């Protein structure tokens, strides 16, 4: 090979190495810029831990501009001192993808209590700015999720600060949250609601969409007797459990009964609080028995299951357990007129 050819080959190889190195440096630069911009972690199995000693803030990527798609970011705020709380305040500039059927399914930010996994709230859309959130201890977790469609702006920004428990505002007895009311008062309060949506919104103003979604999420471990035995459809419109009462003479007719009284449960609230059951009613004016007075009594009784919302106080902490449950109530299938006080009819 000539000396001239060898020089050309050496020059070409050197240029290729320089180009590769420049490309690698450029790639690393973009990667570093991208990682710095995320303001959190991309892997949903990990979280970015932020030590909180002074005021600060976290925000969606590119805030207040359109956030990126396909993003999952998790932050866990941990106060330096143990006996303090963390307060979150949302910036007035708030806008994520709109909910579907009033439920935040796609793009949302949610706040979780790390101690017990309770979701304090999930928010999306741009109609209202979420209210302040206060942790139960010295930690709180925030998660931001966006899917591959319709990113919005400006995203969100959450300001955090330390709150001393002894200096938090006391809740006035007149504005106690529903979960803090005695069961009897709460039972009276919820009877005024005609739809399940309004009831859940009253109980959990910040996270009612989540609770409503959880109630109707299929869970095989919790399927009730009404589902397994096919006594009624699993999908029940709890807003339409009222009907006209028709009067018959000693026949099964609709009666409204209090579930708490029927089951003798004073530790639990049910909604609806009353249900229609078949009970013998009417009169026996045309009684065929030769007696002074007849009465209408059941001759065939069965038990039927009704799916209702059950509210029970949580043990040791403030709040209510909410679940759909089946209650068994007596229904009179057939009725007869018998002499009052008679055992044989």
Swiss-Prot record:
Record bears the keyword Nucleus: yes
A GO term, aspect molecular function: protein homodimerization activity
SUPFAM superfamilies associated with the record: Cystine-knot cytokines, Spermadhesin, CUB domain
CUB domain boundaries: 46-163
Tissues where the protein occurs: Expressed in the fallopian tube, vascular smooth muscle cells in kidney, breast and colon and in visceral smooth muscle of the gastrointestinal tract. Highly expressed in retinal pigment epithelia. Expressed in medulloblastoma. In the kidney, constitutively expressed in parietal epithelial cells of Bowman's capsule, tubular epithelial cells and in arterial endothelial cells (at protein level). Highly expressed in the platelets, prostate, testis and uterus. Higher expression is observed in uterine leiomyomata.
Pfam family, one: PDGF
Signal peptide coordinates: 1-22
Localization, UniProt: Cytoplasm, Cytosol; Secreted; Nucleus; Cytoplasmic granule
Description of post-translational modifications: Proteolytic removal of the N-terminal CUB domain releasing the core domain is necessary for unmasking the receptor-binding epitopes of the core domain. Cleavage after basic residues in the hinge region (region connecting the CUB and growth factor domains) gives rise to the receptor-binding form. Cleaved by PLAT and PLG. Sumoylated with SUMO1.
GO cellular component: cell surface; cytosol; endoplasmic reticulum lumen; extracellular exosome; extracellular region; extracellular space; Golgi membrane; nucleus
Main subcellular location: cytoplasm
Result, substituting residue 234 to A: Not essential for cleavage by PLAT
Keyword match Glycoprotein: yes
Assigned protein family: Belongs to the PDGF/VEGF growth factor family.
Complex and partners: Homodimer; disulfide-linked. Interacts with PDGFRA homodimers, and with heterodimers formed by PDGFRA and PDGFRB. Interacts (via CUB domain) with PLAT (via kringle domain).
Record-linked PANTHER family: PLATELET-DERIVED GROWTH FACTOR, PLATELET-DERIVED GROWTH FACTOR C
Function: Growth factor that plays an essential role in the regulation of embryonic development, cell proliferation, cell migration, survival and chemotaxis. Potent mitogen and chemoattractant for cells of mesenchymal origin. Required for normal skeleton formation during embryonic development, especially for normal development of the craniofacial skeleton and for normal development of the palate. Required for normal skin morphogenesis during embryonic development. Plays an important role in wound healing, where it appears to be involved in three stages: inflammation, proliferation and remodeling.
Protein name per its UniProtKB record: Platelet-derived growth factor C
């Amino acid at each position: 090979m000539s000396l001239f050819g060898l020089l050309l080959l050496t020059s070409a190889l050197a240029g290729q190495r320089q180009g590769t190195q420049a490309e690698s440096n450029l790639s690393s630069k973009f990667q570093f810029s991208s990682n710095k911009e995320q303001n959190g972690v991309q892997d949903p199995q990990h979280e970015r831990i932020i030590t909180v000693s002074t005021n600060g803030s976290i925000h969606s990527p590119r805030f207040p501009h359109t956030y990126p798609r396909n993003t999952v970011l998790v932050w866990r705020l941990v106060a330096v001192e143990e006996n303090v709380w963390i307060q979150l305040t949302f910036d007035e500039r708030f806008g994520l993808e709109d909910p579907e059927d009033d439920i935040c399914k796609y793009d949302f930010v949610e706040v979780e209590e790390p101690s017990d996994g309770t979701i304090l709230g999930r928010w999306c859309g741009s109609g209202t700015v979420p209210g302040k959130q206060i942790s139960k201890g010295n930690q709180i977790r925030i998660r931001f999720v966006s899917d591959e469609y319709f990113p919005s702006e400006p995203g969100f920004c959450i300001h955090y600060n330390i709150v001393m428990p002894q200096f938090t505002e006391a809740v006035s007895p007149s504005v106690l949250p529903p979960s803090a009311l005695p069961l009897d008062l709460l039972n009276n309060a919820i009877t005024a609601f005609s739809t399940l949506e309004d009831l859940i919104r009253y109980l959990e103003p910040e996270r009612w969409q989540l609770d409503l979604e959880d109630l109707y999420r299929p869970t095989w471990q919790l399927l009730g007797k009404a589902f397994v035995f096919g006594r009624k459809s699993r999908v029940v419109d709890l807003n339409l459990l009222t009907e006209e009462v028709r009067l018959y003479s000693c026949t099964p007719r609709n009666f409204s009964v209090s579930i708490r009284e029927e089951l003798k449960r004073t530790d639990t609230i049910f909604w609806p609080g009353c249900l229609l059951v078949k009970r013998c009613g009417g009169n026996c004016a045309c009684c065929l028995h030769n007696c002074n007075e007849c009465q209408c009594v059941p001759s065939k009784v069965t038990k039927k299951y009704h799916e209702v919302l059950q509210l029970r106080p949580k043990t040791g902490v403030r709040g209510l357990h909410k679940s759909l449950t089946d209650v068994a109530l007596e229904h009179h299938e057939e009725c007869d007129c018998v002499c009052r006080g008679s055992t044989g009819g």
